[in-house]
């Protein structure tokens, strides 16, 4: 049996618009990146994408992605329910902790459901170190796979000039 590759699974791509996006394949690396950006004072202009198997899916397949059942996708109500619980109770909570913003609630949320996918959107304005910024988290699961896409974007809010 060979050793697993322990290198961080991260890459950087540039979009057509010229934006730089960090792409992660691992939840821990993603969360560590957010924590480091917060500590480096670059928390208000982050654009990253995470594509991963949720921990509950890996647990059921004994940590082997090859053993994940084909029925584990957006058409499976149990998968969707567990994914939503994972997002609400773990992913968003971990983002709050990494940003050092325990008061972050993500009250502006929505759900879009189509035959091909389910998308949850979470938005919140936050203030950290006297800087306002918007946080956008989009979680998407598809009809053909247990892989989950997470887009994490923070955008600085321009300061309003005093009249």
UniProtKB/Swiss-Prot annotation:
Which source organism? Lachancea thermotolerans (strain ATCC 56472 / CBS 6340 / NRRL Y-8284)
Q: What is this protein called?
A: Respiratory growth induced protein 1
Q: What does this protein do?
A: Involved in the control of energetic metabolism and significantly contribute to cell fitness, especially under respiratory growth conditions.
Query: Cellular component GO terms, alphabetically?
Result: plasma membrane
Give the signal sequence positions.
none
Q: Where in the cell is it found?
A: Cell membrane
Tell me which Gene3D superfamilies the record gives. Answer: Respiratory growth induced protein 1
Q: Biological process GO annotation list?
A: energy reserve metabolic process
